[in-house]
Regions:
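Periplasmic-binding protein-like
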Residues: 46-50
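Solvent-exposed alpha-helical segments within well-ordered globular domains of core cellular machineries
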Residues: 14, 33-38, 56, 60-63
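C-terminal binding/interaction regions
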Residues: 37, 45, 78
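Short secondary-structure boundary segments
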Residues: 28, 51-53, 78
């Protein structure tokens, strides 16, 4: 299983890339929701790290995934 970070901040994404985590930078709610759906369908990602702003933009979708799926584990970072 892979780990990925969905970030709204380029600096956060770069820092996590240096630690070996794949990252994407997205700032649009619809794109984030679509990306989360893709992650669930592909079933390759075990952990999704999201920044605070991403969580706030897509709180309902993230909580739905947390409540209805064992994977991926979604972790918020500041």
């Amino acid at each position: 299983m892979e780990v990925i970070c969905i970030s709204d901040n380029l600096e956060t994404a770069i820092g996590l890339r240096f630690s070996g985590i794949n990252t994407v930078v997205i700032n649009n709610r619809e794109e984030i929701n679509n990306y989360l759906e893709t992650i669930i369908k592909e079933n390759k990602i075990g952990i999704v790290v999201v920044t605070k702003k991403i969580y706030e933009l897509c709180k309902e979708k993230i909580e739905q995934i947390r409540n209805n799926s064992k994977l991926p584990l979604i972790v918020n970072i500041p």
